[in-house]
Regions:
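Small cysteine-rich, disulfide-bonded extracellular modules of the LU/uPAR three-finger superfamily
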Residues: 1-101, 105-146
Length: 146
């Protein structure tokens, strides 16, 4: 498959070098997934990505590490399940839901701008005592996402 005049093998190589997956001669990049909340009236994009929940940070919320598989047909996906902390309080409200995922180069919240943002198919809620698990292969990226 050629997309934008690029061969699939070249697309795969770009994805490996950008997201790194421990292939020979390629270091594994430390990448993390953050949860983005409702953005009324805003486009879902990097500039408006918001990890604050109902206007405040949560006491036990942390970004989760993600490791990508080797790209296939110009698409790269998470190779393992991604598990966030169990919520020690409600992470969402009736007006603030999880609508997107952001991929970051750091677990540190000083790194505010994600390298890519993915919209979820439907808004999700997380109540106290619940744990968000993202199944293997559910986070998929292609060059059109970056």
């Amino acid at each position: 498959m050629a997309k934008y005049g690029l061969q699939t093998s070249f697309l795969n190589e770009i994805l490996i070098r950008y997201f790194g997956n421990g292939s020979p001669n390629i270091d594994i990049n430390e990448l993390y997934v953050g949860l983005g909340t409702t953005q009324t009236g805003a486009d879902i994009n990097m500039e408006t990505f918001n990890e604050l929940f109902d206007g405040k940070p949560l006491c036990n919320y942390q970004r989760a590490r993600i490791i990508f598989n080797t790209p296939e047909n110009g698409v790269i996906s998470n190779g393992d399940e991604i598990c966030f902390n169990t919520a020690s309080e409600d992470w969402t409200t009736t007006t603030s839901k999880i609508e997107m995922l952001g991929i970051f180069r750091s677990a540190d919240f000083d790194d505010k701008e994600p390298i890519v943002v993915i919209s979820l198919p439907k808004p999700e809620t997380v109540s106290k005592g619940e744990t968000i698990l993202l199944a293997k292969g559910v986070v998929q990226l292609s060059l059109t996402d970056i």
